[in-house]
Amino acid sequence: MDNLIPVESLHFVGNGSVAMGCEGADIVQIFAPCYSMPGVMTLRMTESDLTVQSFRIRGSAGYMARISDGEKLIGEMTDYTHPTLPVLIRRVTLSRPLSFVLESPFHPVNTDGVYQSRAISRLFEIPDGTVVFSKSKTDKETYCQMLLSPNCSEKEGSIIFPAGESYLIFVGGDYGEHGTESFANCMSLSDAMLGADLDRVYADFQAYWRGIFHSVQVNRGALAQIPDAEELIEAVTVALMTQTSAQGGVIAGAFYHLAYGRDMYGVFRGYMALGLYEPARRMVEYMCGIYRQKGYMPNASGMGMSCSHRHENDSVEQTGYYLLELLEYTEATGDVGFLRDRMDYAVFLLEAQEKQLVRGMIPFNGDETYIAGGLFPRSGIDHGSMEATALYIGAATRFLDACEKYELMSREEISTHSALTEDSRARFVENFTDGDTVYINNPLRISDADTPACRHGVCHGCSRMTNLLRTPEGGYLCPSCYGKTSAPVFNERYSTDCAIWMSAFAGCSLLSVDRMKDALMRTVTQARDNHFGETNPGNTVGYEYGIILYTLASCLSPEDLPSYRDFLEAILDDRVTGSVWTEYYRNGKPSEASCPYRPWESAINLCGIIAYLNATHKGD
Protein backbone atom coordinates (compact mmCIF):
# COMPACT_ATOMS: atom_id res chain seq x y z
CA MET A 1 0.00 0.00 0.00
CA ASP A 2 3.00 2.36 0.40
CA ASN A 3 3.13 2.73 -3.37
CA LEU A 4 -0.59 3.48 -3.62
CA ILE A 5 -1.75 7.00 -2.76
CA PRO A 6 -5.53 7.35 -2.16
CA VAL A 7 -7.33 9.87 -4.39
CA GLU A 8 -10.86 11.23 -4.38
CA SER A 9 -13.34 12.03 -7.13
CA LEU A 10 -12.26 12.68 -10.71
CA HIS A 11 -8.63 12.43 -11.83
CA PHE A 12 -6.89 12.47 -15.21
CA VAL A 13 -4.73 9.95 -17.01
CA GLY A 14 -3.09 11.44 -20.09
CA ASN A 15 0.04 12.02 -22.16
CA GLY A 16 -0.81 15.06 -24.30
CA SER A 17 -2.45 13.13 -27.14
CA VAL A 18 -4.88 10.91 -25.23
CA ALA A 19 -6.63 11.66 -21.94
CA MET A 20 -9.17 10.00 -19.70
CA GLY A 21 -11.18 11.47 -16.86
CA CYS A 22 -11.84 8.71 -14.36
CA GLU A 23 -13.98 8.59 -11.22
CA GLY A 24 -13.61 5.38 -9.27
CA ALA A 25 -13.75 2.61 -11.85
CA ASP A 26 -15.89 4.71 -14.21
CA ILE A 27 -14.52 6.33 -17.34
CA VAL A 28 -16.42 9.64 -17.43
CA GLN A 29 -14.65 11.02 -20.51
CA ILE A 30 -11.94 9.89 -22.88
CA PHE A 31 -10.58 11.57 -26.01
CA ALA A 32 -7.75 11.37 -28.55
CA PRO A 33 -5.61 12.08 -30.57
CA CYS A 34 -5.65 15.72 -29.41
CA TYR A 35 -7.02 17.59 -26.42
CA SER A 36 -9.53 19.89 -28.14
CA MET A 37 -11.97 17.06 -28.61
CA PRO A 38 -15.34 16.18 -27.08
CA GLY A 39 -15.55 13.14 -24.84
CA VAL A 40 -15.82 10.11 -27.13
CA MET A 41 -17.38 7.60 -24.73
CA THR A 42 -18.15 6.76 -21.12
CA LEU A 43 -17.95 3.43 -19.33
CA ARG A 44 -19.85 3.12 -16.04
CA MET A 45 -20.04 0.19 -13.66
CA THR A 46 -23.55 -1.25 -13.43
CA GLU A 47 -23.41 -2.62 -9.86
CA SER A 48 -24.00 0.42 -7.66
CA ASP A 49 -23.56 -1.45 -4.37
CA LEU A 50 -19.88 -2.18 -4.99
CA THR A 51 -17.19 -0.09 -3.31
CA VAL A 52 -14.34 1.41 -5.33
CA GLN A 53 -11.15 2.87 -3.89
CA SER A 54 -8.91 4.83 -6.26
CA PHE A 55 -5.16 5.27 -5.93
CA ARG A 56 -2.37 6.97 -7.81
CA ILE A 57 0.63 4.71 -8.22
CA ARG A 58 3.53 6.48 -6.55
CA GLY A 59 6.26 7.65 -8.91
CA SER A 60 3.98 7.75 -11.95
CA ALA A 61 0.76 9.14 -13.40
CA GLY A 62 -0.82 5.68 -13.41
CA TYR A 63 -3.91 4.89 -11.34
CA MET A 64 -5.42 1.80 -9.79
CA ALA A 65 -9.04 1.20 -8.81
CA ARG A 66 -9.76 -1.53 -6.25
CA ILE A 67 -13.30 -2.90 -6.36
CA SER A 68 -14.84 -4.61 -3.35
CA ASP A 69 -18.11 -6.35 -2.57
CA GLY A 70 -18.49 -5.69 1.12
CA GLU A 71 -15.26 -6.85 2.74
CA LYS A 72 -14.27 -8.98 -0.23
CA LEU A 73 -11.88 -7.61 -2.86
CA ILE A 74 -13.16 -8.70 -6.26
CA GLY A 75 -10.76 -6.94 -8.59
CA GLU A 76 -8.30 -4.27 -9.64
CA MET A 77 -8.07 -2.00 -12.67
CA THR A 78 -4.83 -0.24 -13.61
CA ASP A 79 -4.88 2.73 -16.00
CA TYR A 80 -1.88 4.14 -17.86
CA THR A 81 -0.91 5.49 -21.27
CA HIS A 82 1.71 4.82 -23.87
CA PRO A 83 4.50 7.34 -23.13
CA THR A 84 3.98 9.23 -26.39
CA LEU A 85 1.34 7.67 -28.66
CA PRO A 86 -2.43 8.38 -28.44
CA VAL A 87 -3.04 5.10 -26.60
CA LEU A 88 -4.63 4.52 -23.18
CA ILE A 89 -4.56 1.10 -21.53
CA ARG A 90 -6.70 -0.37 -18.75
CA ARG A 91 -5.54 -3.71 -17.32
CA VAL A 92 -8.23 -5.61 -15.43
CA THR A 93 -7.98 -8.49 -12.93
CA LEU A 94 -11.25 -9.83 -11.47
CA SER A 95 -12.44 -12.74 -9.38
CA ARG A 96 -15.84 -12.60 -11.11
CA PRO A 97 -17.30 -10.91 -14.20
CA LEU A 98 -18.08 -7.21 -13.99
CA SER A 99 -20.36 -5.24 -16.31
CA PHE A 100 -20.03 -1.63 -17.50
CA VAL A 101 -22.51 0.39 -19.57
CA LEU A 102 -20.93 1.86 -22.71
CA GLU A 103 -22.39 5.17 -23.89
CA SER A 104 -21.29 7.52 -26.64
CA PRO A 105 -22.77 10.45 -28.57
CA PHE A 106 -21.11 8.89 -31.63
CA HIS A 107 -22.50 5.65 -32.98
CA PRO A 108 -19.85 2.96 -32.36
CA VAL A 109 -19.22 0.67 -35.32
CA ASN A 110 -18.66 -3.03 -34.59
CA THR A 111 -15.27 -3.84 -36.12
CA ASP A 112 -14.87 -7.34 -34.64
CA GLY A 113 -14.62 -8.68 -38.18
CA VAL A 114 -11.48 -6.66 -38.84
CA TYR A 115 -9.59 -8.36 -36.03
CA GLN A 116 -11.33 -11.76 -36.11
CA SER A 117 -10.64 -13.38 -32.74
CA ARG A 118 -7.90 -10.93 -31.72
CA ALA A 119 -10.21 -8.35 -30.10
CA ILE A 120 -13.70 -7.11 -29.38
CA SER A 121 -13.58 -3.70 -31.06
CA ARG A 122 -15.71 -0.60 -31.54
CA LEU A 123 -14.78 2.23 -33.90
CA PHE A 124 -15.91 5.82 -33.24
CA GLU A 125 -16.17 8.45 -35.97
CA ILE A 126 -16.21 12.04 -34.70
CA PRO A 127 -17.30 14.20 -37.65
CA ASP A 128 -15.67 17.44 -38.68
CA GLY A 129 -17.75 20.24 -37.11
CA THR A 130 -18.45 18.49 -33.80
CA VAL A 131 -18.79 20.89 -30.85
CA VAL A 132 -15.84 21.01 -28.45
CA PHE A 133 -17.10 23.89 -26.29
CA SER A 134 -19.72 26.57 -26.93
CA LYS A 135 -19.23 27.53 -30.60
CA SER A 136 -15.78 25.93 -30.89
CA LYS A 137 -15.85 22.91 -33.19
CA THR A 138 -13.51 20.28 -34.57
CA ASP A 139 -12.08 20.99 -38.00
CA LYS A 140 -11.03 17.47 -38.95
CA GLU A 141 -12.68 14.08 -39.17
CA THR A 142 -11.43 11.98 -36.24
CA TYR A 143 -11.38 8.25 -35.60
CA CYS A 144 -10.89 6.50 -32.27
CA GLN A 145 -11.19 2.82 -31.43
CA MET A 146 -11.82 0.81 -28.28
CA LEU A 147 -10.13 -2.59 -28.27
CA LEU A 148 -11.06 -5.22 -25.69
CA SER A 149 -9.25 -8.47 -25.04
CA PRO A 150 -11.07 -11.34 -26.80
CA ASN A 151 -12.25 -12.86 -23.50
CA CYS A 152 -14.44 -9.77 -22.91
CA SER A 153 -17.96 -9.61 -24.31
CA GLU A 154 -20.61 -7.07 -25.25
CA LYS A 155 -24.31 -7.48 -24.54
CA GLU A 156 -27.05 -4.91 -25.11
CA GLY A 157 -24.73 -1.93 -24.78
CA SER A 158 -22.79 -3.28 -21.82
CA ILE A 159 -19.18 -4.42 -21.74
CA ILE A 160 -18.47 -7.46 -19.57
CA PHE A 161 -14.97 -7.94 -18.23
CA PRO A 162 -14.54 -11.66 -17.32
CA ALA A 163 -13.03 -13.34 -14.29
CA GLY A 164 -9.27 -13.43 -14.67
CA GLU A 165 -7.17 -10.98 -16.64
CA SER A 166 -8.40 -8.77 -19.47
CA TYR A 167 -7.76 -5.34 -20.93
CA LEU A 168 -9.17 -2.30 -22.67
CA ILE A 169 -7.07 -0.27 -25.12
CA PHE A 170 -8.32 3.09 -26.42
CA VAL A 171 -6.59 4.34 -29.57
CA GLY A 172 -6.78 7.69 -31.36
CA GLY A 173 -5.90 8.13 -35.02
CA ASP A 174 -3.35 10.87 -35.62
CA TYR A 175 -4.30 13.24 -38.44
CA GLY A 176 -1.06 13.01 -40.39
CA GLU A 177 0.64 15.75 -42.36
CA HIS A 178 -2.47 16.88 -44.24
CA GLY A 179 -5.06 16.32 -41.50
CA THR A 180 -6.79 13.52 -43.40
CA GLU A 181 -5.14 10.35 -42.11
CA SER A 182 -6.99 9.76 -38.83
CA PHE A 183 -8.81 6.63 -40.01
CA ALA A 184 -5.74 4.99 -41.53
CA ASN A 185 -3.57 5.84 -38.54
CA CYS A 186 -6.22 4.66 -36.08
CA MET A 187 -6.45 1.28 -37.79
CA SER A 188 -2.68 0.81 -38.11
CA LEU A 189 -2.02 1.85 -34.51
CA SER A 190 -4.82 -0.43 -33.29
CA ASP A 191 -3.23 -3.35 -35.10
CA ALA A 192 0.16 -2.51 -33.62
CA MET A 193 -1.21 -2.29 -30.08
CA LEU A 194 -2.89 -5.69 -30.34
CA GLY A 195 0.57 -7.11 -30.93
CA ALA A 196 2.30 -4.98 -28.30
CA ASP A 197 3.76 -6.22 -25.02
CA LEU A 198 1.56 -4.30 -22.57
CA ASP A 199 3.97 -5.01 -19.71
CA ARG A 200 6.74 -3.39 -21.75
CA VAL A 201 4.54 -0.39 -22.46
CA TYR A 202 3.85 -0.08 -18.72
CA ALA A 203 7.58 -0.25 -17.92
CA ASP A 204 8.25 2.48 -20.50
CA PHE A 205 5.42 4.55 -19.01
CA GLN A 206 6.92 4.28 -15.52
CA ALA A 207 10.39 5.18 -16.82
CA TYR A 208 8.96 8.21 -18.61
CA TRP A 209 7.39 9.52 -15.41
CA ARG A 210 10.49 8.80 -13.34
CA GLY A 211 12.34 11.04 -15.78
CA ILE A 212 9.81 13.85 -15.30
CA PHE A 213 9.94 13.66 -11.50
CA HIS A 214 13.74 13.53 -11.62
CA SER A 215 13.67 16.81 -13.58
CA VAL A 216 11.73 18.63 -10.85
CA GLN A 217 13.92 21.24 -9.15
CA VAL A 218 12.60 22.52 -5.82
CA ASN A 219 14.11 23.25 -2.42
CA ARG A 220 13.35 19.95 -0.77
CA GLY A 221 14.82 21.15 2.50
CA ALA A 222 12.19 23.88 2.63
CA LEU A 223 9.42 21.49 1.57
CA ALA A 224 10.35 19.13 4.40
CA GLN A 225 8.42 21.52 6.68
CA ILE A 226 5.18 19.84 5.56
CA PRO A 227 4.24 16.15 5.61
CA ASP A 228 4.12 14.20 2.36
CA ALA A 229 5.92 16.92 0.41
CA GLU A 230 7.04 14.54 -2.34
CA GLU A 231 3.47 13.30 -2.71
CA LEU A 232 2.30 16.90 -3.15
CA ILE A 233 4.97 17.63 -5.78
CA GLU A 234 4.11 14.46 -7.69
CA ALA A 235 0.37 15.09 -7.51
CA VAL A 236 0.54 18.63 -8.86
CA THR A 237 3.10 17.69 -11.51
CA VAL A 238 0.79 14.90 -12.68
CA ALA A 239 -2.24 17.21 -12.71
CA LEU A 240 -0.39 19.74 -14.86
CA MET A 241 1.39 17.35 -17.21
CA THR A 242 -1.60 15.09 -17.92
CA GLN A 243 -3.68 18.13 -18.91
CA THR A 244 -0.96 19.69 -21.07
CA SER A 245 -1.40 18.85 -24.74
CA ALA A 246 1.28 17.65 -27.11
CA GLN A 247 1.02 21.07 -28.79
CA GLY A 248 1.82 22.87 -25.51
CA GLY A 249 -1.59 24.28 -24.62
CA VAL A 250 -3.31 23.23 -21.40
CA ILE A 251 -6.98 22.39 -20.95
CA ALA A 252 -8.71 24.26 -18.12
CA GLY A 253 -9.97 21.04 -16.53
CA ALA A 254 -12.44 18.35 -17.46
CA PHE A 255 -15.16 20.83 -18.46
CA TYR A 256 -13.06 22.99 -20.77
CA HIS A 257 -11.05 21.34 -23.56
CA LEU A 258 -9.49 24.60 -24.79
CA ALA A 259 -6.38 26.56 -23.77
CA TYR A 260 -7.36 29.75 -21.88
CA GLY A 261 -5.01 32.70 -21.33
CA ARG A 262 -5.41 33.27 -17.61
CA ASP A 263 -5.36 29.55 -16.83
CA MET A 264 -2.27 29.07 -18.98
CA TYR A 265 -0.38 31.71 -17.00
CA GLY A 266 -1.11 29.98 -13.70
CA VAL A 267 0.07 26.64 -15.08
CA PHE A 268 3.15 28.32 -16.58
CA ARG A 269 4.05 29.67 -13.15
CA GLY A 270 3.53 26.22 -11.66
CA TYR A 271 5.95 24.69 -14.15
CA MET A 272 8.50 27.41 -13.45
CA ALA A 273 8.18 26.88 -9.68
CA LEU A 274 8.84 23.17 -10.26
CA GLY A 275 11.86 23.90 -12.44
CA LEU A 276 10.14 22.18 -15.37
CA TYR A 277 11.26 24.67 -17.99
CA GLU A 278 10.62 22.49 -21.03
CA PRO A 279 6.80 22.32 -20.72
CA ALA A 280 6.82 26.01 -19.76
CA ARG A 281 8.73 26.77 -22.96
CA ARG A 282 6.30 24.72 -25.04
CA MET A 283 3.40 26.71 -23.60
CA VAL A 284 4.95 29.96 -24.84
CA GLU A 285 5.79 28.41 -28.21
CA TYR A 286 2.19 27.21 -28.52
CA MET A 287 0.69 30.65 -27.87
CA CYS A 288 3.17 32.32 -30.22
CA GLY A 289 2.15 29.77 -32.84
CA ILE A 290 -1.52 30.68 -32.36
CA TYR A 291 -0.71 34.34 -32.99
CA ARG A 292 1.34 33.59 -36.09
CA GLN A 293 -1.39 31.34 -37.43
CA LYS A 294 -4.33 33.67 -36.78
CA GLY A 295 -2.85 37.16 -36.51
CA TYR A 296 -4.73 37.78 -33.24
CA MET A 297 -5.21 36.07 -29.87
CA PRO A 298 -8.59 34.42 -29.20
CA ASN A 299 -9.87 34.12 -25.65
CA ALA A 300 -9.18 30.40 -25.80
CA SER A 301 -7.58 28.27 -28.49
CA GLY A 302 -7.79 24.73 -29.78
CA MET A 303 -5.06 22.14 -29.33
CA GLY A 304 -4.73 19.96 -32.40
CA MET A 305 -7.72 21.82 -33.84
CA SER A 306 -7.86 25.34 -35.29
CA CYS A 307 -11.01 26.24 -33.33
CA SER A 308 -11.11 29.12 -30.88
CA HIS A 309 -13.41 30.74 -28.34
CA ARG A 310 -14.11 34.48 -28.58
CA HIS A 311 -15.26 36.92 -25.93
CA GLU A 312 -15.41 40.66 -25.48
CA ASN A 313 -12.10 42.57 -25.30
CA ASP A 314 -9.86 39.59 -26.03
CA SER A 315 -6.97 41.94 -26.77
CA VAL A 316 -6.54 42.79 -23.08
CA GLU A 317 -5.63 41.02 -19.84
CA GLN A 318 -4.69 37.69 -21.39
CA THR A 319 -2.24 39.53 -23.64
CA GLY A 320 -0.56 40.84 -20.50
CA TYR A 321 -0.22 37.31 -19.16
CA TYR A 322 1.21 36.04 -22.46
CA LEU A 323 3.83 38.80 -22.49
CA LEU A 324 4.76 37.97 -18.89
CA GLU A 325 5.21 34.29 -19.80
CA LEU A 326 7.61 35.18 -22.58
CA LEU A 327 9.60 37.52 -20.33
CA GLU A 328 9.65 35.27 -17.27
CA TYR A 329 10.91 32.31 -19.28
CA THR A 330 13.65 34.47 -20.81
CA GLU A 331 14.65 35.89 -17.42
CA ALA A 332 14.73 32.48 -15.72
CA THR A 333 16.71 30.70 -18.43
CA GLY A 334 18.82 33.54 -19.80
CA ASP A 335 17.75 32.49 -23.29
CA VAL A 336 17.55 35.93 -24.90
CA GLY A 337 17.46 34.30 -28.32
CA PHE A 338 14.08 32.82 -27.40
CA LEU A 339 12.69 36.33 -26.91
CA ARG A 340 14.54 37.73 -29.93
CA ASP A 341 12.99 35.09 -32.20
CA ARG A 342 9.50 36.05 -30.98
CA MET A 343 9.66 39.83 -31.10
CA ASP A 344 6.79 39.94 -33.61
CA TYR A 345 4.62 38.17 -31.03
CA ALA A 346 5.85 40.32 -28.13
CA VAL A 347 5.26 43.59 -29.97
CA PHE A 348 1.77 42.45 -30.96
CA LEU A 349 0.96 41.69 -27.30
CA LEU A 350 2.18 45.11 -26.24
CA GLU A 351 0.43 47.08 -28.96
CA ALA A 352 -2.85 45.16 -28.56
CA GLN A 353 -3.05 46.54 -25.03
CA GLU A 354 -1.88 50.03 -25.96
CA LYS A 355 -4.73 50.35 -28.47
CA GLN A 356 -7.21 49.90 -25.60
CA LEU A 357 -5.74 52.63 -23.37
CA VAL A 358 -8.24 55.33 -22.46
CA ARG A 359 -7.32 57.75 -19.67
CA GLY A 360 -4.45 55.42 -18.88
CA MET A 361 -6.81 52.47 -18.30
CA ILE A 362 -7.29 49.05 -19.90
CA PRO A 363 -10.82 47.52 -19.93
CA PHE A 364 -11.98 44.16 -18.62
CA ASN A 365 -11.81 40.97 -20.66
CA GLY A 366 -15.17 39.25 -20.99
CA ASP A 367 -14.15 35.79 -19.83
CA GLU A 368 -11.00 35.90 -17.76
CA THR A 369 -11.86 38.32 -14.94
CA TYR A 370 -14.48 38.93 -12.28
CA ILE A 371 -17.14 39.28 -14.96
CA ALA A 372 -17.16 35.60 -15.93
CA GLY A 373 -17.47 34.60 -12.27
CA GLY A 374 -20.42 36.94 -11.68
CA LEU A 375 -18.49 39.13 -9.24
CA PHE A 376 -18.81 42.21 -11.44
CA PRO A 377 -21.65 43.15 -13.86
CA ARG A 378 -20.95 42.49 -17.53
CA SER A 379 -22.44 45.88 -18.41
CA GLY A 380 -19.33 47.42 -16.86
CA ILE A 381 -16.96 45.53 -19.14
CA ASP A 382 -15.57 48.68 -20.78
CA HIS A 383 -14.75 50.34 -17.46
CA GLY A 384 -11.12 50.66 -16.54
CA SER A 385 -9.92 47.40 -14.97
CA MET A 386 -7.44 47.72 -12.12
CA GLU A 387 -6.05 44.23 -12.70
CA ALA A 388 -5.77 44.44 -16.49
CA THR A 389 -4.17 47.88 -16.25
CA ALA A 390 -1.65 46.69 -13.66
CA LEU A 391 -0.79 43.72 -15.88
CA TYR A 392 -0.24 46.02 -18.84
CA ILE A 393 2.03 48.39 -16.92
CA GLY A 394 4.02 45.59 -15.28
CA ALA A 395 4.46 43.50 -18.42
CA ALA A 396 5.17 46.48 -20.68
CA THR A 397 7.79 47.88 -18.30
CA ARG A 398 9.64 44.58 -18.07
CA PHE A 399 9.47 44.07 -21.81
CA LEU A 400 10.78 47.54 -22.65
CA ASP A 401 13.57 47.15 -20.09
CA ALA A 402 14.57 43.89 -21.81
CA CYS A 403 14.40 45.56 -25.22
CA GLU A 404 16.78 48.27 -24.03
CA LYS A 405 19.14 45.86 -22.27
CA TYR A 406 19.43 43.43 -25.19
CA GLU A 407 18.99 45.99 -27.99
CA LEU A 408 15.83 44.34 -29.31
CA MET A 409 14.13 47.60 -30.32
CA SER A 410 15.26 51.05 -31.41
CA ARG A 411 15.56 53.80 -28.79
CA GLU A 412 12.85 55.79 -30.58
CA GLU A 413 10.41 52.88 -30.43
CA ILE A 414 11.20 52.21 -26.78
CA SER A 415 10.63 55.88 -25.98
CA THR A 416 7.26 55.92 -27.74
CA HIS A 417 6.00 52.83 -25.93
CA SER A 418 7.45 53.96 -22.58
CA ALA A 419 5.57 57.25 -22.76
CA LEU A 420 2.26 55.37 -22.84
CA THR A 421 3.30 53.04 -20.03
CA GLU A 422 4.50 55.86 -17.79
CA ASP A 423 1.33 57.87 -18.39
CA SER A 424 -0.75 54.88 -17.31
CA ARG A 425 1.48 54.36 -14.28
CA ALA A 426 1.22 58.02 -13.25
CA ARG A 427 -2.59 57.85 -13.32
CA PHE A 428 -2.95 54.44 -11.68
CA VAL A 429 -3.41 55.47 -8.04
CA GLU A 430 -5.85 58.23 -8.97
CA ASN A 431 -7.76 55.91 -11.31
CA PHE A 432 -8.19 53.00 -8.91
CA THR A 433 -7.93 54.25 -5.33
CA ASP A 434 -9.74 56.70 -3.09
CA GLY A 435 -8.19 57.12 0.31
CA ASP A 436 -7.77 53.64 1.76
CA THR A 437 -10.15 52.04 -0.75
CA VAL A 438 -8.89 50.13 -3.80
CA TYR A 439 -11.40 49.75 -6.64
CA ILE A 440 -11.38 47.01 -9.26
CA ASN A 441 -13.02 49.32 -11.82
CA ASN A 442 -13.33 52.92 -12.95
CA PRO A 443 -16.44 53.93 -14.95
CA LEU A 444 -14.74 57.11 -16.21
CA ARG A 445 -13.01 55.15 -18.95
CA ILE A 446 -16.25 54.72 -20.91
CA SER A 447 -16.81 58.47 -21.17
CA ASP A 448 -13.95 58.65 -23.69
CA ALA A 449 -13.92 55.06 -24.98
CA ASP A 450 -14.93 54.33 -28.57
CA THR A 451 -16.78 51.07 -27.96
CA PRO A 452 -17.61 49.00 -31.07
CA ALA A 453 -21.05 49.09 -32.67
CA CYS A 454 -20.95 45.28 -32.90
CA ARG A 455 -19.06 42.70 -30.88
CA HIS A 456 -19.11 38.99 -30.07
CA GLY A 457 -19.87 38.17 -26.46
CA VAL A 458 -22.61 37.61 -23.91
CA CYS A 459 -25.95 39.36 -24.40
CA HIS A 460 -26.83 41.67 -21.49
CA GLY A 461 -30.44 40.60 -21.88
CA CYS A 462 -30.66 36.82 -22.40
CA SER A 463 -27.03 35.96 -21.50
CA ARG A 464 -26.57 34.02 -24.74
CA MET A 465 -23.12 33.91 -26.35
CA THR A 466 -23.57 35.41 -29.80
CA ASN A 467 -23.02 38.52 -31.92
CA LEU A 468 -24.20 41.71 -30.26
CA LEU A 469 -25.29 45.25 -31.10
CA ARG A 470 -24.52 48.31 -28.98
CA THR A 471 -27.68 49.90 -27.60
CA PRO A 472 -28.34 53.65 -27.23
CA GLU A 473 -27.76 53.22 -23.48
CA GLY A 474 -24.29 51.81 -24.18
CA GLY A 475 -24.83 48.15 -23.30
CA TYR A 476 -24.98 45.22 -25.71
CA LEU A 477 -27.89 43.05 -26.83
CA CYS A 478 -28.29 40.26 -29.34
CA PRO A 479 -30.53 40.91 -32.38
CA SER A 480 -33.33 38.94 -30.72
CA CYS A 481 -33.33 41.09 -27.56
CA TYR A 482 -32.58 44.40 -29.26
CA GLY A 483 -35.49 46.83 -28.95
CA LYS A 484 -37.30 44.57 -26.48
CA THR A 485 -35.29 45.32 -23.35
CA SER A 486 -32.87 47.97 -22.20
CA ALA A 487 -29.15 47.50 -21.61
CA PRO A 488 -27.87 50.38 -19.51
CA VAL A 489 -24.20 50.63 -18.65
CA PHE A 490 -23.29 49.93 -15.04
CA ASN A 491 -21.75 53.04 -13.46
CA GLU A 492 -20.86 52.16 -9.87
CA ARG A 493 -17.45 51.35 -8.42
CA TYR A 494 -16.59 48.00 -6.87
CA SER A 495 -14.03 47.35 -4.18
CA THR A 496 -12.71 43.93 -3.22
CA ASP A 497 -9.28 43.17 -1.85
CA CYS A 498 -9.07 39.91 -3.80
CA ALA A 499 -8.46 41.95 -6.97
CA ILE A 500 -5.08 42.99 -5.60
CA TRP A 501 -3.64 39.51 -5.26
CA MET A 502 -3.51 38.44 -8.90
CA SER A 503 -1.49 41.47 -9.96
CA ALA A 504 0.77 40.89 -6.95
CA PHE A 505 1.22 37.24 -7.97
CA ALA A 506 2.17 38.40 -11.47
CA GLY A 507 4.73 40.85 -10.06
CA CYS A 508 2.71 43.79 -11.38
CA SER A 509 1.33 45.41 -8.24
CA LEU A 510 1.51 49.21 -8.26
CA LEU A 511 0.22 49.74 -4.73
CA SER A 512 2.40 50.84 -1.85
CA VAL A 513 3.70 48.23 0.58
CA ASP A 514 1.62 49.75 3.38
CA ARG A 515 -1.57 49.61 1.31
CA MET A 516 -0.80 46.02 0.37
CA LYS A 517 -0.25 45.06 4.00
CA ASP A 518 -3.48 46.75 5.11
CA ALA A 519 -5.45 44.85 2.47
CA LEU A 520 -3.68 41.63 3.41
CA MET A 521 -4.62 41.98 7.06
CA ARG A 522 -8.27 42.60 6.14
CA THR A 523 -8.25 39.49 3.97
CA VAL A 524 -6.55 37.43 6.67
CA THR A 525 -9.16 38.50 9.22
CA GLN A 526 -12.04 37.68 6.87
CA ALA A 527 -10.65 34.24 6.07
CA ARG A 528 -10.15 33.40 9.72
CA ASP A 529 -13.58 34.76 10.69
CA ASN A 530 -15.32 32.41 8.23
CA HIS A 531 -13.05 29.52 9.27
CA PHE A 532 -11.41 29.37 5.83
CA GLY A 533 -14.66 29.05 3.95
CA GLU A 534 -16.41 26.60 6.26
CA THR A 535 -19.04 29.22 7.14
CA ASN A 536 -19.10 30.87 3.72
CA PRO A 537 -22.36 29.96 1.87
CA GLY A 538 -21.05 31.49 -1.35
CA ASN A 539 -18.30 30.23 -3.61
CA THR A 540 -14.67 30.59 -2.61
CA VAL A 541 -12.30 30.23 -5.54
CA GLY A 542 -9.99 27.25 -5.22
CA TYR A 543 -6.79 29.30 -5.47
CA GLU A 544 -7.75 32.04 -2.98
CA TYR A 545 -5.65 30.91 -0.04
CA GLY A 546 -2.74 29.94 -2.26
CA ILE A 547 -2.51 33.40 -3.79
CA ILE A 548 -2.91 35.02 -0.36
CA LEU A 549 -0.11 32.83 1.00
CA TYR A 550 2.08 33.82 -1.95
CA THR A 551 1.42 37.51 -1.25
CA LEU A 552 2.10 37.08 2.47
CA ALA A 553 5.45 35.49 1.62
CA SER A 554 6.23 38.39 -0.73
CA CYS A 555 5.21 41.26 1.58
CA LEU A 556 6.08 40.15 5.11
CA SER A 557 9.40 39.43 6.76
CA PRO A 558 10.33 35.75 7.29
CA GLU A 559 10.11 36.29 11.06
CA ASP A 560 6.42 37.24 10.80
CA LEU A 561 5.35 34.43 8.45
CA PRO A 562 4.98 31.57 10.98
CA SER A 563 1.95 33.43 12.39
CA TYR A 564 0.16 32.68 9.11
CA ARG A 565 0.83 28.97 8.90
CA ASP A 566 -2.92 28.41 9.30
CA PHE A 567 -3.25 29.54 5.65
CA LEU A 568 -0.78 26.86 4.63
CA GLU A 569 -2.75 24.26 6.59
CA ALA A 570 -6.03 25.45 5.04
CA ILE A 571 -4.62 24.99 1.54
CA LEU A 572 -3.34 21.52 2.31
CA ASP A 573 -6.67 20.56 3.89
CA ASP A 574 -8.58 21.67 0.78
CA ARG A 575 -6.87 19.10 -1.46
CA VAL A 576 -9.19 16.64 -3.17
CA THR A 577 -9.21 14.78 -6.48
CA GLY A 578 -5.77 13.26 -6.63
CA SER A 579 -4.36 15.44 -3.83
CA VAL A 580 -4.84 18.64 -5.83
CA TRP A 581 -7.55 21.33 -5.93
CA THR A 582 -10.91 22.02 -7.49
CA GLU A 583 -12.41 25.18 -9.01
CA TYR A 584 -14.75 26.38 -6.24
CA TYR A 585 -15.45 25.57 -2.61
CA ARG A 586 -18.65 26.20 -0.68
CA ASN A 587 -18.92 25.83 3.08
CA GLY A 588 -15.41 24.45 3.07
CA LYS A 589 -16.22 21.65 0.60
CA PRO A 590 -15.87 21.39 -3.19
CA SER A 591 -18.89 23.01 -4.83
CA GLU A 592 -21.15 20.64 -6.75
CA ALA A 593 -20.87 22.84 -9.85
CA SER A 594 -17.10 23.06 -9.53
CA CYS A 595 -14.77 21.79 -12.24
CA PRO A 596 -12.56 19.20 -10.49
CA TYR A 597 -8.85 18.44 -10.83
CA ARG A 598 -8.02 21.95 -12.01
CA PRO A 599 -4.56 22.86 -13.34
CA TRP A 600 -4.90 26.61 -12.62
CA GLU A 601 -5.86 26.32 -8.95
CA SER A 602 -3.37 23.53 -8.33
CA ALA A 603 -0.48 25.45 -9.90
CA ILE A 604 -1.17 28.69 -8.02
CA ASN A 605 -1.63 26.91 -4.69
CA LEU A 606 1.66 25.10 -5.21
CA CYS A 607 3.37 28.43 -5.97
CA GLY A 608 1.99 29.84 -2.72
CA ILE A 609 3.13 26.82 -0.73
CA ILE A 610 6.63 26.87 -2.22
CA ALA A 611 6.99 30.65 -1.73
CA TYR A 612 5.91 30.42 1.91
CA LEU A 613 8.12 27.43 2.74
CA ASN A 614 11.13 28.94 0.98
CA ALA A 615 10.67 32.17 2.94
CA THR A 616 10.37 30.40 6.31
CA HIS A 617 13.13 27.84 5.70
CA LYS A 618 16.06 28.28 8.07
CA GLY A 619 18.34 25.73 6.44
CA ASP A 620 21.20 26.25 4.02
Spans of features found by a protein language model:
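Active/binding-pocket-proximal capping segment
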Residues: M283-I290, D518-R528, S557-G588
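Solvent-exposed loop and edge beta-strand segments that line ligand/cofactor-binding
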Residues: L198-Y208, Q247-Y265, M272, S306-T319, ...
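Terminal accessory carbohydrate-recognition/targeting modules of carbohydrate-active enzymes
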Residues: M1-L223, R262-D263, A273-L274, S554-P558, ...
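Aromatic-rich carbohydrate-recognition surfaces in CAZymes
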Residues: H257-G360, S385-I393, L561, R565-L568, ...
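Conserved oxyanion/phosphate-binding beta-strand-loop segments in alpha/beta enzyme cores
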Residues: I57, G211-G253
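Active-site acid/base region of carbohydrate-active enzymes
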Residues: S215-A235, M287, R292-Y296, L327-E387, ...
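Structural helix-adjacent loops and short alpha-helical linkers that scaffold large soluble proteins
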Residues: V218-E230, Y271-V284, Y329-V347, L400-E422, ...
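Catalytic cores of carbohydrate-active enzymes
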Residues: M297-A300, V358-N365, I381-S385, L391-D518, ...
